[in-house]
Amino acid sequence: MASRNSPLNPSVHFDNFRNWLELEGEAERQRMESRRNRLTPAEAERSGSTLLNMVVTSHTTGLGGRYLLTLQKRHAPERLPWHRFRVGSPVSLSSEQDHRPLSGVVSARRRDHIEVALNKWPEGDSFRVDMTPDEVTRKRQREAMDAAEHATGRLAKLRDLLLYHADPDFGEPPEPEGAEHLDDSQRQAVAFALSAQDLAIIHGPPGTGKTTTVVEVIRQAVANGQRVLACAPSNTAVDNLLERLIATGARAVRLGHPARVLEVVRSHTLDALVEQHDARPVIQDMLKEADQLERRSRRYTRARPAPGQKHQQRKEARELRRHARMLEQHAINQLLADAEVICATVSFDFRVLDESTFDLLVIDEACQSVEPGCWIPLRHVQRVVLAGDHCQLPPTILSGEAAQQGLDVSLMQRLVEHFGDTVTRQLTVQYRMHEQIMQFSSDHFYDG
């Protein structure tokens, strides 16, 4: 039986998390700064967190005008040294000529090169690439908590429920159609989640089919004409969810940097779908013409150009780029409007959705996310279903002080401890675990 807590003051609650995020950010900065200060450039490279003397060997342009740079070693182009860079790693790119680093993301890695996505073209001939802290995610988390604290309308009602000022509501549980492949506990969980007017939680030990159950909740919601926002803390978990949704025939679009998406589902990313859109050839022609005009405006000629000619060329290039962005945005809006399910990590920048709202938010592996992360997608939804295992390891926290004070307590764990069976359904049949391990897990963590 859960023990009910007193209602939480929104200002105090969110201020606590703001302070803990500061502690976490400082812990991450100190760890990277310590590593950088105590290591020479050569040692930093040997540690795997830095690549030196990198040169741009080719580049392309991606969605939103991002530059995708291919970088190789200047003096050893056949192979990169061992390094920790992974697809999706946030990085900084700096040169000897311009010491102001540019922020980017690793979009691909091969034996002889890495590809980095940047919003600006870097100045210089030779570059240093360093791993960097992920400050962008913490900024989004703070903004989401600010919005929740001062919210009106549906977000305010969800906030009040999640901070214990109200109780959850449920309708009559429907009988899920076409769910014969599920066991009894999974079907009950699906029906329970679909009956929730604001909050439901699905939990269970490893191997009980939580993601299978979540996918069925989404499939049933879509069949009822609802739009769904499907999230998880990690890119791998989102891609796993997306792959299963695609198999059900759902029209799903994956938001997020293609560099962070598994290749098997990359064709469903917004970037890939825009590339295939009817407007793409026109957009590419506009950008190509803009590039040519800008090159002409910078080109030296012996003959004196007509007065204002170069200025006019740059102006025309800007206009072409503006029209290309408008066409691209129209394609994006169309693709998002046609989607039944939008998939993304909880920390994604959902501004691309503008004022769009969804009937249902599902967060898989919710216990692996710090609470501030969950408030980011909550801004766009009517109700939420959380799925995960609150008896497993909590989110990874670098700051011992922040973890001790409460940053390592997930939103799902907090709600399970407060509301208990009122909002939860447990999956009970384990499909993939050694029998003795399964019994130990059941006895020690799930009350038998």
Residue ranges and their predicted role:
Residues 213, 217, 237:
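Hydrophobic positions on the alpha1 helix immediately C-terminal to the Walker A/P-loop
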Residues 1-86:
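A helicase ATPase "motif cassette" and its flanking acidic/Ser/Thr-rich regulatory loops
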Residues 204, 257, 365:
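The Walker A (P-loop) glycine that initiates the GxxxxGKT/S ATP-binding motif of P-loop NTPases
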Residues 224-226, 234, 248, 347-448:
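Conserved helicase motor core of SF1/SF2 NTP-dependent helicases
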